[in-house]
Amino acid sequence: IPLQQSERVPSEIQLKALQIIDRVQDNRLSKDYLPKKEAGEILMQFKLSAIDMTKGDWLILARTNPLLKPIPKYLKSMGLFFETAQGNSIGKTLFEDIDYWNKMRKGEKIPEVQEQRVLERMSKRDNKLEWYDAFDHVALSKKDYLRSMLANGEDLSKKPRIKVSTIHGAKGGEA
């Protein structure tokens, strides 16, 4: 049974997709397929700096990987949390280790494996130090990026709000 109504595709996005697919001359069968009620929005911009991505969910698409290449660098310079096909922009464990370090500083007991991982990020343990001073085995650029994201109000305990992908790689994805 073919699907009659989308639960993901907003009307503006479907309209644009239909304008593109209507140019395909192959033997396509016409289908009745209704978008979800939400309108959605398509922003076609040629400069990332013209877009305020500090709020909301974003899906940044480009046709090829070479076109995507400068985007993560820009997002990092703006202190924005994002994900690519390679994962999120800070890696899996650094934010967790900061949380564990804060617990260790308060005298809370944490699992031994996590404690060892935290201690590997520093030369010597000093509970008086904030994570960004204590973690001297973490690159300064990474610490600056993390502090910038936190200052921007990014919630690093959740999935990133911004996804960066090729059009092909995003098939089925949504912002």
Model-assigned labels for residue ranges:
Residues 1-175:
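The feature marks helicase ATPase cores and/or their adjacent C-terminal helical subdomains
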